[in-house]
From Swiss-Prot:
The keyword Transferase applies. This is Bifunctional protein PyrR. It catalyses: UMP + diphosphate = 5-phospho-alpha-D-ribose 1-diphosphate + uracil. The gene is pyrR. The lineage of its organism: Bacteria, Bacillati, Cyanobacteriota, Cyanophyceae, Synechococcales. It comes from Synechococcus sp. (strain JA-2-3B'a(2-13)). A motif (PRPP-binding) lies at residues 97-109. Signal peptide: none annotated.
Length: 182
């Protein structure tokens, strides 16, 4: 197994800044904007985006937290985890929602998130913001806002480390098939 640091803390902060600027540019009137972080790492990213957008535009958008455990179609592959509670700041009917996640790969997480959102109202529009797009989609789902497109192989893993969840800041590319020569 090999690990390569793709982004360090400073570069990661730059990606988040770029996402915040793009979202802020598209939503100058924040009254209808709700950022919704997909658990786990999408939640701290949503709060960071809120803080940056508030700095840029003077008003913080609303933030929600979405747990998709029971909406996944791949529960048997990774085992059942204990679900968390979804928390929404308001009814999403008529709102402009930006779903936030750390990495998009096959599109299954986002598909589940879209299904879970139906329980919180009918948004006017739903967009997707991701830190890393690594390709290899199985569903026709594409991010509207993307920090970086990273070329990967399907057997590789992209792992985002955030201080809120991992006590450090970086992005790793992990290749489980690589052999270390001795």
């Amino acid at each position: 197994m090999s690990e390569i640091e793709v982004f360090d803390a400073e570069q990661l902060a730059g990606l988040i800044e770029g996402l915040a600027e793009a979202i802020g540019r598209d939503h100058p009137h924040l009254q209808k904007l709700t950022l919704i972080g997909i658990r786990t790492r999408g939640v701290p990213l949503a709060y960071r985006l809120r803080d940056r957008i508030a700095t840029l535009l003077g008003i913080p958008p609303q933030v929600g937290e979405l747990d998709i455990t029971f909406f996944r179609d791949d529960l048997s592959a990774g085992g059942l985890r204990t679900p968390d509670r979804s928390e929404m700041p308001r009814d999403l009917t008529g709102q402009e929602v930006v779903l936030v996640d750390d990495v998009i790969f096959r599109g299954r997480t986002v598909r589940a998130a879209l299904e879970a959102l139906n329980h919180f109202g009918r948004p006017e529009r739903v967009r997707l913001a991701v830190l890393i797009d690594r390709g290899h989609r199985q569903f026709p789902i594409q991010p509207d806002y993307c920090g970086c497109q990273l070329s990967t192989e399907p057997e590789q893993t992209v792992r985002v480390h955030l201080r809120e969840t991992d006590a450090e800041e970086r992005v790793l590319l992990i290749d489980k098939t690589a052999k270390i020569k001795s």
